[in-house]
Amino acid sequence: IPLAWWATARLLRLDVPVRAQSDGETPPGKSPLFDRASVPLFLSYAGAGLGYILPMTFLPLLAKDQLPADHWLLDGAWFLAAVATILSPSIWNYLGAKIGDLPALRMNFVVQLAGVLAAVILPGALGLAVCAALVGSTFVGTVMLTQRIGRALHPHQGPRLSAAMVSVYGFTQMAGPWLTKQWLEAGGT
């Protein structure tokens, strides 16, 4: 709570200048949010939301089905994912600065895919541990890199773009488990 009070006091002291607008300029927020440049980013971000939430939602269930009752990964898979999540932002930030945000985001998606496939292809504890570490390591990187790319595409859309992308990501994270349930009840595997 003291940190929250300190942060609030600092935020209240911020002096954010109002941007002057020329007559011929489109007012911020009045140009389209979805266009040829941003739609692929939104769609890939939605896919990343599904790619993250599905393995993370069902990781404990997979662990329970594949491991003995006293195995440390029953609870430890979440710990591995958390440690990977904590360590990853600086890595993805470095890669984004070094090779560019778009190539880093593509790499992030490949790492996420490898993590999802590990849970399916590698049996038992190894697959679950690799899934937790790889998928966990991509979560914050996906968000950070996508937000930066979005702001580069539409610098004038800052808050609107961020809000729309967070909404898309959140929607897919809520819809993913429900869609999976429907799929499984319909006989899917």
Regions found by a protein language model. Name each.
Residues 154-188:
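A late C-terminal transmembrane helix in Major Facilitator Superfamily
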Residues 103-118:
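Structural signature of the two symmetry-related core transmembrane helices
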Residues 46, 79-83, 133, 163-171:
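Transmembrane alpha-helical cores of Major Facilitator Superfamily
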Residues 2-22:
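C-terminal membrane-cytosol helix-exit motif in multi-pass small-molecule transporters
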Residues 87-101, 184-185:
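Helix-to-loop junctions at the C-terminal end of transmembrane segments
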Residues 126-134:
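Paired small-residue
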Residues 37-86:
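Extracytoplasmic gate region of multi-pass secondary transporters
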Residues 140-154:
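Intracellular juxtamembrane helix-capping segments at the cytosolic ends
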